[in-house]
Amino acid sequence: MSHCGKKTTFDAIRYSDAPPCFTHTMCEALYPGHPRAKTDEQLEHIARNGGMIGITALGYFVGSDPGGKTNIETYLDHIDHAVRLVGVDHVGLSSDFQVQGIRPWATKENWYEPRLKSFKPSYNVKWPPWIPELDSTDRFLNVTYGLFKRGYSDSAIRKILGLNWMRYFEQIIGL
């Protein structure tokens, strides 16, 4: 449902027998006008139905200036907003790209230019697309440290880093 519009999202939540999920999204309250951002009302409906919200780490999805003013703090602001809104049990990490990051393989020619042609201008695709602190395997350590600095407990950090996703998948597929 991360790619769905508002009506489809609410219909899917209403008619789903299983807890719904945004696998990779961000908070419209912090990045208004981005077509992939979800409203507080959508996030609340997901949580109310036992679902999960994965906050994406793709730079131009969480802020307007990836590689510049959009940084790890911007990303953590989205996590904070979602946690304050729906509770820590419904929020997790999401990258929307592979573990080694984008920088090791992406070039303007093979990554940026195709997206400029295929994505709507409202997606605000920028080069470079990554947030430096989130574009390597160290991203999980950087997020952990950032959440710790913001006062999150060890238990809350573990949930956000993966325990919430494990619980969700156990619930959905019965692991």
Identify the residue ranges that each predicted region occupies:
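Conserved, mostly hydrophobic/aromatic
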Residues: 24, 53, 96, 157
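Mid-to-C-terminal alpha-helical segments outside catalytic/metal-binding sites
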Residues: 125-175
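Histidine/acidic residue-rich metal-binding segments in metalloenzymes
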Residues: 1-21, 34-51, 73-89
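A conserved active-site cap/scaffold subdomain adjacent to cofactor or substrate pockets
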Residues: 47-72
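Glycine-rich tight-turn/loop motif centered on a GG-T
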Residues: 25-39, 53, 67-69
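Short glycine/threonine-rich loop-to-helix capping motif typified by GTGT followed
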Residues: 67-68, 102-108, 169-175
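Short acidic/histidine-rich active-site segments
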Residues: 86-111, 115-119, 123-133
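Active-site beta-loop-alpha junctions enriched in small/polar residues
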Residues: 4-7, 25-28, 58-60, 96-100
